[in-house]
Regions:
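Loop/helix patches that line or flank the sugar-binding groove of alpha-linked glycan CAZymes
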Residues: 1-104, 109-110
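Intrinsic-disorder/low-complexity regions
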Residues: 28, 97, 120, 131-132, ...
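A residue-level signal for conserved active-site and pocket-lining positions in enzyme catalytic cores
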Residues: 54, 119, 140
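Beta-strand-rich binding/interaction modules
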Residues: 103-123
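Short beta-strand and strand-turn-strand segments in soluble, beta-rich domains
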Residues: 124-129
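C-terminal beta-strand-rich structural cap/linker in extracellular carbohydrate-active enzymes
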Residues: 130-152
Length: 152
């Protein structure tokens, strides 16, 4: 539950049980949880809706099919990245995630984007070309750069 909503750690439960694992074992009352995610002033509301948006986008991408080809890309310890190709080989997605609390610059040349295709970040609709040299990812930012966009 905590991962879906970004809820706060339950330090009181840790103190009560004496177990560190209790930090994310809070039992939620349905109404309290609904109040958190339905109030657009709460960060839990934003996180829940953003997760839902990303799931909707992801479900429409052939390259995210469970049987699609996947390769891990190496951009250092602050970047978690992988490349996926749809079964029919029409769609490629470069999923690039900054897993650090600092901005990270990566070379788009290392992705080897095919110059004859248009490339779009599925999360922001930002366009990329094979001529773009690099991109800076903000802390914890993710990009899903695809050559074939399925509408969100």
């Amino acid at each position: 539950c905590h991962s879906f909503f970004g809820t706060e750690n339950d330090h009181d439960l840790v103190a009560k049980t004496g177990r560190a694992r209790s930090i994310n074992r809070h039992s939620w009352n349905d109404n309290d949880l609904k109040d958190l995610i339905l109030n657009d002033k709460n960060p839990e509301n934003y996180l829940f809706n953003e997760l839902r948006r990303r799931i909707r986008i992801r479900r429409k991408q052939e390259a995210f099919h469970p049987n699609a080809t996947q390769l891990t890309l190496h951009f250092g310890s602050s970047i978690f990245a992988f490349w996926r190709e749809s079964i029919n080989r029409k769609q490629c997605i470069f999923a690039i995630n900054n897993i650090s609390d600092k901005s990270q610059k990566i070379s788009l040349l290392e992705l080897n984007l095919i110059g004859t295709e248009s490339w779009t970040d599925l999360l922001t609709d930002k366009k990329f070309t094979a001529n773009d040299n690099s991109i800076t990812l903000e802390p914890y930012q993710s990009l899903w750069i695809s050559n074939e966009s399925r509408s969100s």
